[in-house]
Amino acid sequence: MNTEKVISRDNDYILHTYGRSQVVLAEGKGMTARDADGKEYLDFTSGIGVNSLGYCHPAWVKAVADQAATLQHTSNLYYTAPDGKLAKKICRRTGLDAVFFGNSGAEANEGAIKCARKYSVDTYGESRSKVITLVNSFHGRTLATLTATGQDVFHHDFGPFPGNFAYVPAGDFAALEKAADASACAVMMELVQGEGGVVALDADYVAKVAAFCKEKDILLIVDEVQTGVGRTGKFLACEHFDLHPDIVTLAKGLGGGLPIGAVVMNKKVAEHMKPGSHGSTFGGNPVCCAGALAVLDTMDEEFLANVNERAAQLRAGLAKLPHVQQVSGLGLMVGIAFDDGIKAADVRAACEKQGLLVLTAKTRLRLLPPLILTAEDVNAALDTLRTAFGGKTCLLYTSPSPR
C-alpha cells in the first residue's frame, strides 16, 4: 500500500469535510494500529470512542464473521435473532423497556427527539414540542440533531433549522426552569460534554433537572452516545448520577467498530410508538448486532473493574505531568487542559509523531482509549505525553494543515 497514492486518491474523490492527519492506517490489533509504512501507534482514540474492544478482538471478529457468513441483512420486515437478543441485553443493563436500532449516534438522537415529541403530542397536544438542550452540547449532524447541538460553530451556513429548540447554560438551573414553559416536551443532555471540552455536569444540577422533569412530566433524554457502554467505568454514565431517564441513546462503542445506534426508552414512551411511526432500513442489522453482542458479552464486572482501575491510573499520572492544569471527564473519557501557550492541536501532532494517537476537543486534549488497555499501555502513553510536554516538542512541531 502506497501512502501517497492513498492520500491522493482520497483527496480526489472523498468530499473534503475532514481535516485528516497525514497517516494511512492499514491494520490494527488490540491497542496498536499500524500505518501503511509499517509504523506502529498506541491508539488512545479508539476511532473516537468506537473500538471499545480495540482492534480485531478475537470474540468480536468471530461473532461478526460467523453472522456475515450466515445472514447479512433482511430489513425490518422480518424477524431475526440477533436484534432481539441484543435489545434484551441492553434493557437488562439499563433498566429500560424497549429499544429502537439505527445506525449512528445522530440517528439515535433524532429518534429520541421523535419519540419524545410523539409522547408529548399524544398526551398534551401539538403545542408541547420544545426540546431543551445545553450550551456546548453536541448531539449530531443531521438537521434536527444539529439544531439540538448548543454550539453556533456547527450551525453556520446550514439554516433554516427546525423550530422548537432552546439552549440553556449547563449548571444554570434557573435558566432551565425559565425555558421549560408550557411548550416544553423534553430536556436532552450529555452527562459529559464530549465535543464541548470533555466536561462532566455537576451531580447536584443533574439531580435537580431530573426531579424537575419528573414533576412537570417533561421527558429526560440522556445522550450516552459517547459515555455509554462502559466508557466511564459503568455501563451507563447515568449510574454515576443515580439517574433514571425516560430515554437513553447509545452508539459509538456499542458496535465495537460497526455502525449501530440505539434509542432505549421506558414503557411510558414506548407505548406511543406504533408501526409506521419510525423506521430504519439498516437498523438492527444482524451483523452489526452480532458485533454488539460480542461487546456486551465481553463487558462483564471484571472488564469494567479494569476500566475503573486504568482510568484512576491514567488520571493520576496525567495530573503529575508538566503543563497540565486540569484533568476532566469521567472514567476513560478524559480531557486535559494545558497552561497558556500550549495548544492541544500541537500536542496531538507531537504525540502522533512519537507513535501515540490522541484527540482534541476545543482547547483540550481528549483521550478515548479502547477499554481493553493495560497498566503497561497507560504507562507507555504517559511516557510519550511526558516527553511531549517536558521536551516542549509540542511547541516545536507544526501540525499539518487541514484539507
Language-model features: where?
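Active-site-adjacent loop/helix segments that line or gate small-molecule/cofactor pockets in enzymes
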Residues: 1-29
